[in-house]
Amino acid sequence: MMPSFCLAGTLMMALFLSSLRPESLDPCVEVDSNTSYQCMDRNLNKIPDNIPSSVKHLDLSFNPLKTLGSHSFFNFPELKLLDLSRCEIETIEDKAYQGLHQLTTLILTGNPIQNLSKGTFSGLANLQNLVAVEIKLASLDSLPIGHLVTLKKLNVAHNLIHSFKLPEYFSNLTNLEHLDLSNNYIQTIYYTDLQTLRENPQLNLSLELSLNPIDFIQPGAFQGIRLHELTLRSNFNSTNVMKTCIHNLDGLQVHRLILGEFKNERNVERFDRYVIEGLCKVTIEEFRFTYANEFSEDITDFDCLANVSAMSLANVYLKRLEDIPKYFKWQTLAVIRCELKQFPPLELPFLKRLIFITNKGATSFPEVNLPSLTFLDLSGNGMSFRGCCSYTDLGARSLKHLDLSFNGVISMSENFMGLEQLEYLDFQHSTLKKATEFSMFLPLEKLLYLDISYTNTKIDFNGIFFGLTSLNTLKMAGNSFKDNILSNVFTNTTNLTFLDISKCQLQQVSWGVFDTLHRLELLNMSHNNLLLLDLFHYKQLHSLKTLDCSFNHIETSKGIMQHFPKSLAFLNLTNNPFACICEHQNFLQWVKDQRLFLVKTEQMTCATPVEMKDSLVLDFRNATCYVQKTIISVSVISVLVVSTIAFLVYKFYFHLILIAGCKKYSRGESIYDAFVIYSSQDEDWVRNELVKNLEEGVPPFQLCLHYRDFIPGVAIAANIIQEGFHKSRKVIVVVSRHFIQSRWCIFEYEIAQTWQFLSSHSGIIFIVLEKVEKSLLKQQVELYRLLSRNTYLEWEDNALGRHIFWRRLKKALLDGRAWNPEGATEAENNQQETTTSI
C-alpha cells in the first residue's frame, strides 16, 4: 500500500506544478536592474508582489487587471512611468495612485473605464503626461484633472468627445503645453468653447484637432486666441467646407499652423487659391501644408503668407512654383516630395534656409540669388551639376550648410571659391567626377563635417583633403583606394574626431596613416578585406574610444595587445573568420579577458580549424594547447633522443664492439705484443724494418699484422677489433703523410684511443715515419693534440738514429710484458749462434 500512496502523491504534485503558468512564478522581466520592469501580456489580475520598491518604469499593459483598488501602487514611491494600456480596467477607486508623488507619465490607453470620480487621479502631485486615448471619454468635463497643475501634455484622442468646449478647470493647468483631441467627433467650434483660453492668455498651447469631422467654425471663434500650434488635417469633407472654416479662423494668432490631410485620409478633392486667401486675417509665424492631391495653377499666389518666417510644402502636388515676390519675408522654405518639374528661380533676400528635397522632376539647378542663405539642402532630387562648386553655381556667399546627397553626377570643376564659410558638406550617394584631380576642399578651413560616402570616388591623390584643418567628422564609406591600400591622406585633418572608412575594399593600411589623428574618438573600418588586426596602426590614437573592425577577414592580431590606446572603450571584431588555433593562443586568450571591452563577443565565431567552425571564440580552451604542446615536446624530445642514440650507435658502433670485446677478453692473456696500424703505402718499411728488427731481434716480439694475422672471410673492422686490439698488449701507430690521408687508418686510430681508455694504461706507441707538415697534421685535431702533448718515436735513417730508435721502441714494448728469463737466454743464445755461423 505504501508504494501506491507515494506514487499517487507524486502524480498529484506533478499535475499541480504543470498547471502553474511560468509567468505566475516570475511574471515580469527586469529591463534595468531594480528600476525598470516589463510585465506586458502576462495574464495578471493583480499587481505582482515581487517588484521592488525602487522601480521607476513599470509596464503592466495587456493584463486583465479589471479594477484598480485604493493604494494599488503605494509600494512604488519612486515610480516615474506607469503603463496600464488595455488592461480591461473598468473601475479606478479613489486614491488608487496614492503615494506616486514622483510619477510623471501615466498611460491608460484602451481601457473601458466606466466612471471617473473626483479622487481618481489624487496623489499625482508631479504628473506631466496623461495619455487617456480610447477610454470611451464622452467629454472633457468628465475628466477630473483640474488639480494636476503640473500637467504638460494631455492626450484624449480617439474618444467619444463631441464638444470642443474647454472646461473651466483648464485655467488651473497653467503648465499645459499640448492638448490632443484628434480623432474624436467634434463637428462644431463656437466662440464660447475657447473662453477659458481668452481668460488665460498666459497659456502657450498646441492644439491637435486632426481627424475630427468639422463642418462649422463660428466666425470669430478664434478671435483673441493665441496658440503655439494648431493642426487641422483631414478635418473637412469638401473644398467648400474647408474654405469656409479657414476663413472663420480670422483673429487667430498662432506660431505654427498645419493644414492639409493624411496620406490615407483624403477628403478634399481639389485645393484652390481661396483656401490660402482665408489665411489673410490669421497671424502666422510658420505655415505647413501637407498632402494635397490637386492644386490649381493659380495657387502660387501666397500673398497672404508673405510675412510668415517659415513656409513648408510637403507631399503637395505642384506643377510650378515661381514668381515669388522679393518682398516676401520668408526665412525658411521647405519643398518636400512635391513633384515639381523644375527648380524655381528664386530671388529672396531674406531667405536663410532652403530645403528642396525628393522632388524627382527637378534635374538641374537654375540661377538663384539668395544673399542671406546659410542652409541649402538639395538632397534626393537626382540633380546633375556640370560644374561645382562655387558662389556662382549656388548663388549664395554665406552658406554654412550644403547638402547635395542622393543626386546624380556632380562634376567637380572648382574648389568652393566664395563658399569659405561652409561648415557642413554632404555628397553621399551622388557620383563625384574629377574629385581627386586637385585639392578641391583647399579653401574650406572652417568645414567641420564632410560626407563623400558612396560617391564612386577612387582615392589616388594624397592631397585630396588638404585645407580641412578644422574638420572633425569625415565619412567616406563605400569608396576605394589605389591598390586597396589606405594611403596617407589624413595628414592635414588633425582635428578629426569621427572617421568612417567602411566598405572601401581595404586590404592593407600604410604605416603612419593615423599618426596625426590624436583627437580621433571613433574609427569605423568595418566591411573591408583586412587580414590582420595590426595594433601598431592605432598606437598614436590617444583619444580613440570606439574602433569597429567587424565584417573583415581578420584571423588574428599582429603586435602586442597593450599597444591599444588606453582610452578605447568599445572594440567590434564580430563577423571575422577567426583562426582558433594554438598559434594564436595569446590573441584568443586576450579576447576572453576583454569580453566586457569587446562588442558582442557572443557573436565572435571560429572559421578554422574545421572541427571548431562556427563555434564561439570564447569556447576555445588553452588547455588543449598545453596538451598539444606537451605531446609535441615529448615527441620532439623522443625523436631527438632516438636520433642521437642511433647516430652515436652508428658512429661508435665499432667502439661499442670494442667495449664488448674488452669485457670478454679482459681476463685472458694477450697473444701479440703489439698491433701495428699503418698505411698500405708504408708497408715496405713495416716489413723490412719493423718486423725484421722486432720479431727477429732480441728479445723477440710478436706483432699483429693485418696482411698476415687477420682471419680470412671476416669483416675488416671485426678483424681489427677482435684480432688486433683484443689480442695485443700495445698498439704501434706509424704516422706518415699517407696515414693522415687514409680514412681506414684514422678509423683504426680512433678505435685505438677507445681501446687505450678502456685498458686504463698507456698502450699506444707513435712512430713518426717522416716529417709531416703541421697544416696537414692539424686536419686531425685529436692526433695533432696527442702528438703535441705526448712523447713519440721519430725514425731517422742513419746508424746512430737507428740504434736509439730500436732501443727506445723495444723498451716501450717490454713495458708491462711478463718476464721469462729462460726464454730470454734461449733467444739470446740462438741469436749468438746465428751470428757465429754467419
UniProtKB/Swiss-Prot annotation:
<dbReference type="GO" id="GO:0043123">
    <property type="term" value="P:positive regulation of canonical NF-kappaB signal transduction"/>
</dbReference>
<feature type="glycosylation site" description="N-linked (GlcNAc...) asparagine">
    <location>
        <position position="34"/>
    </location>
</feature>
<feature type="domain" description="TIR">
    <location>
        <begin position="670"/>
        <end position="813"/>
    </location>
</feature>
<feature type="repeat" description="LRR 16">
    <location>
        <begin position="543"/>
        <end position="564"/>
    </location>
</feature>
<dbReference type="GO" id="GO:0005886">
    <property type="term" value="C:plasma membrane"/>
</dbReference>
<comment type="similarity">
    <text>Belongs to the Toll-like receptor family.</text>
</comment>
<dbReference type="GO" id="GO:0002730">
    <property type="term" value="P:regulation of dendritic cell cytokine production"/>
</dbReference>
<feature type="repeat" description="LRR 11">
    <location>
        <begin position="421"/>
        <end position="442"/>
    </location>
</feature>
<dbReference type="GO" id="GO:0002755">
    <property type="term" value="P:MyD88-dependent toll-like receptor signaling pathway"/>
</dbReference>
<dbReference type="GO" id="GO:0032874">
    <property type="term" value="P:positive regulation of stress-activated MAPK cascade"/>
</dbReference>
<dbReference type="GO" id="GO:0032727">
    <property type="term" value="P:positive regulation of interferon-alpha production"/>
</dbReference>
<dbReference type="GO" id="GO:2001238">
    <property type="term" value="P:positive regulation of extrinsic apoptotic signaling pathway"/>
</dbReference>
<dbReference type="InterPro" id="IPR003591">
    <property type="entry name" value="Leu-rich_rpt_typical-subtyp"/>
</dbReference>
<feature type="glycosylation site" description="N-linked (GlcNAc...) asparagine">
    <location>
        <position position="237"/>
    </location>
</feature>
<dbReference type="GO" id="GO:0006909">
    <property type="term" value="P:phagocytosis"/>
</dbReference>
<dbReference type="GO" id="GO:0001875">
    <property type="term" value="F:lipopolysaccharide immune receptor activity"/>
</dbReference>
<feature type="glycosylation site" description="N-linked (GlcNAc...) asparagine">
    <location>
        <position position="204"/>
    </location>
</feature>
<keyword id="KW-0812">Transmembrane</keyword>
<feature type="repeat" description="LRR 5">
    <location>
        <begin position="150"/>
        <end position="171"/>
    </location>
</feature>
<feature type="repeat" description="LRR 4">
    <location>
        <begin position="126"/>
        <end position="147"/>
    </location>
</feature>
<feature type="domain" description="LRRNT">
    <location>
        <begin position="26"/>
        <end position="53"/>
    </location>
</feature>
<dbReference type="GO" id="GO:0032757">
    <property type="term" value="P:positive regulation of interleukin-8 production"/>
</dbReference>
<dbReference type="GO" id="GO:0014911">
    <property type="term" value="P:positive regulation of smooth muscle cell migration"/>
</dbReference>
<dbReference type="GO" id="GO:0070434">
    <property type="term" value="P:positive regulation of nucleotide-binding oligomerization domain containing 2 signaling pathway"/>
</dbReference>
<feature type="repeat" description="LRR 1">
    <location>
        <begin position="54"/>
        <end position="75"/>
    </location>
</feature>
<dbReference type="GO" id="GO:1904646">
    <property type="term" value="P:cellular response to amyloid-beta"/>
</dbReference>
<dbReference type="GO" id="GO:0046982">
    <property type="term" value="F:protein heterodimerization activity"/>
</dbReference>
<feature type="topological domain" description="Extracellular">
    <location>
        <begin position="26"/>
        <end position="629"/>
    </location>
</feature>
<keyword id="KW-0520">NAD</keyword>
<dbReference type="GO" id="GO:0060907">
    <property type="term" value="P:positive regulation of macrophage cytokine production"/>
</dbReference>
<feature type="disulfide bond">
    <location>
        <begin position="580"/>
        <end position="606"/>
    </location>
</feature>
<feature type="repeat" description="LRR 15">
    <location>
        <begin position="519"/>
        <end position="539"/>
    </location>
</feature>
<keyword id="KW-0325">Glycoprotein</keyword>
<comment type="subunit">
    <text>Belongs to the lipopolysaccharide (LPS) receptor, a multi-protein complex containing at least CD14, LY96 and TLR4. Binding to bacterial LPS leads to homodimerization. Interacts with LY96 via the extracellular domain. Interacts with MYD88 and TIRAP via their respective TIR domains. Interacts with TICAM2. Interacts with NOX4. Interacts with CNPY3 and HSP90B1; this interaction is required for proper folding in the endoplasmic reticulum. Interacts with MAP3K21; this interaction leads to negative regulation of TLR4 signaling.</text>
</comment>
<dbReference type="GO" id="GO:0002246">
    <property type="term" value="P:wound healing involved in inflammatory response"/>
</dbReference>
<dbReference type="GO" id="GO:0050729">
    <property type="term" value="P:positive regulation of inflammatory response"/>
</dbReference>
<feature type="glycosylation site" description="N-linked (GlcNAc...) asparagine">
    <location>
        <position position="622"/>
    </location>
</feature>
<dbReference type="GO" id="GO:0001726">
    <property type="term" value="C:ruffle"/>
</dbReference>
<dbReference type="GO" id="GO:0032735">
    <property type="term" value="P:positive regulation of interleukin-12 production"/>
</dbReference>
<feature type="repeat" description="LRR 2">
    <location>
        <begin position="78"/>
        <end position="99"/>
    </location>
</feature>
<dbReference type="GO" id="GO:0035666">
    <property type="term" value="P:TRIF-dependent toll-like receptor signaling pathway"/>
</dbReference>
<feature type="signal peptide">
    <location>
        <begin position="1"/>
        <end position="25"/>
    </location>
</feature>
